[in-house]
């Protein structure tokens, strides 16, 4: 069994298909929007399931970096709060989800490379980490 990648390795691989300035800008906007929309959909579907999946995601991030896990927990708390403040339902979250994915694919068309998650599904969680690491200036060295 191959050793799992550390945060620096994941981010280096993610960066390979996120170099074009417009693609990066679209990802800065769309990745958090997708994350938020998924949380909104899950919370509206089943709050208990949303809690369990949120904890699993936090554990994934904690395995990579304690600082990253803290940053992502803060973002998730903001997402949860916004979802609870907004009217219940699915339409808003589906609209955000679809529009943000369109933005992602436009960015990758500009980049000329396929989205990373086609290579490994875990990149769906690395995208938000990429935004958080840059936004908060988190260190990415191996533990």
Where are the regions a protein language model picked out?
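Transmembrane helix-loop junctions and nearby membrane-interface residues
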Residues: 41-45, 69, 84, 112, ...
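Transmembrane alpha-helical segments that form the membrane-embedded catalytic/substrate-channel core
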Residues: 57-68, 72, 97-114, 131-134
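Helix-coil boundary and interhelical linker segments in multi-pass alpha-helical membrane proteins
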Residues: 3, 39-50, 80-93
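Helix-adjacent hinge/juxtasegments
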Residues: 47-85
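Membrane interfacial helix-start motif at the N-side
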Residues: 11-42, 57-67
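Hydrophobic transmembrane alpha-helices
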Residues: 76, 80, 90-104
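Membrane-proximal soluble regions of multi-pass membrane proteins
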Residues: 1-17, 21, 109-143
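Membrane-interface loop-to-helix entry segments
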Residues: 23-29, 69-72, 121, 128
């Amino acid at each position: 069994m191959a050793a799992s990648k550390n945060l620096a390795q994941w981010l280096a691989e993610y960066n390979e298909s996120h170099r074009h300035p417009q693609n990066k800008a679209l990802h800065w906007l769309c990745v958090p929007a997708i994350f938020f929309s998924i949380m909104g959909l899950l919370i509206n579907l089943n709050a208990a399931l949303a809690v369990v999946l949120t904890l699993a995601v936090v554990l994934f991030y904690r395995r990579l970096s304690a600082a990253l896990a803290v940053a992502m927990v803060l973002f998730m708390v903001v997402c949860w709060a916004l979802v609870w403040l907004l009217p219940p339902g699915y339409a808003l979250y589906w609209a955000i989800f679809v529009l943000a994915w369109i933005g992602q694919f436009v960015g990758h068309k500009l980049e000329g490379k396929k989205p990373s998650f086609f290579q490994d599904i875990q990149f769906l969680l690395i995208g938000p980490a990429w935004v958080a690491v840059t936004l908060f200036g988190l260190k990415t060295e191996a533990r």
